[in-house]
Amino acid sequence: MMERFAQIQRTGGPGVIEWADVPLTEPAPGEVRMRNLAVGLNFIDTYHRNGLYPMAKPCGLGMEAAGIIEAVGDGVSDWQVGDRVATFGPTIGAYCTARNIAANSLFGVPDDISHEVAAAGLLKGCTTEFLVERCAKVQPQWDVLVHAAAGGVGLLLVQWLKHVGARVIGTVSTDEKAALARAAGADHVILYGKEDVARQVRELTGGKGVEVSFDGVGLETWEMSLTATARRGLIVSYGNASGPVSGVNLATLAQKGSLYVSRPTLFDYYHNPAERAAGAEYVFDMFRQGVIEMTIGQRYALEDAAQAHRDLEARKTIGSSVLIPSGIK
């Protein structure tokens, strides 16, 4: 049985993504064969591709997908052929039509959650959960800054923060994205290319700044976050969309008001299969209750992954994106 797999032989731009027909064997003990119905696109995929997060080559790409089980290996008792499942890692290689994958890295997808929502929202939803509830521990009435508030994680952050009672200030790059952030619940939206973000934040908060800044943009917004965050406030740097922040002078944190900084990663908060299973169930419940909703702004053919990477890195996307294997409706 031949399946289509994306792979990279070297790091670089989107053009390094190659496609190959690879024979798929029967699942090994502890594995299942999962056929993808939708694959999630995440910024971490670009970091693996461009070498910011090094991996041994050659390697696959992609961490997040949803689909159905086609075969079950020996020793697997939790899953059956036909089950609807999703995964968000830690195994990389989701850019494919089907693959054999460890059974304990899968989560059941409820019947009322579409495969596209599961593929687009599981990793981002779990990221949002740990950022808000366990890393920053956001409290009601806090003022919170969300950079890239119309992005995949950004929109979920806005909704989750409103759910816990925070006042949300979002930054975006266009008027179209500003409207999307407001529709998600943002109390105020700032166009960071046209307005002084830190000054606007200070004005909106009576001069004090925000208790928490969620910054997934990185290099371009780091100084904004430093200046917009309140005394003894927290900057949560969870991504590098514009490039990594480096050479940080710790004395600056004192000068800006004894600030705290965290650089968390998903798999330190979802460290084992039990934690990942509990988190997935919680996030699916939040979708089911309507606390958070997915905005899937782009759908690409699976083999157009390179173009999807170009659009994501150029900030042309809105909300989340999915890659759809050929023949899937």
Regions found by a protein language model. Name each.
Residues 23-40, 50-93:
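Glycine-rich beta-strand-centered segment in the early N-terminal region that forms part
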Residues 47, 87-150:
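NAD(P)H dinucleotide-binding glycine-rich loop of Rossmann-like/cofactor-binding domains
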Residues 84, 143, 167, 233-234, ...:
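Short glycine-centered segments of the SAM/dcSAM-binding site in methyltransferase folds
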Residues 94-96, 173-180, 245-250:
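Short, glycine/polar-rich helix-capping loops at beta-to-alpha or helix-loop-helix junctions
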Residues 119-195:
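Mid-domain Rossmann-like dinucleotide-binding core that forms the NAD(H)/NADP(H) cofactor-binding site
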Residues 172, 220-292, 325-329:
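Glycine-rich phosphate-binding loop and adjacent beta-alpha segment
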Residues 197-207:
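Short amphipathic alpha-helix with an adjacent loop that forms part of the alpha/beta core around
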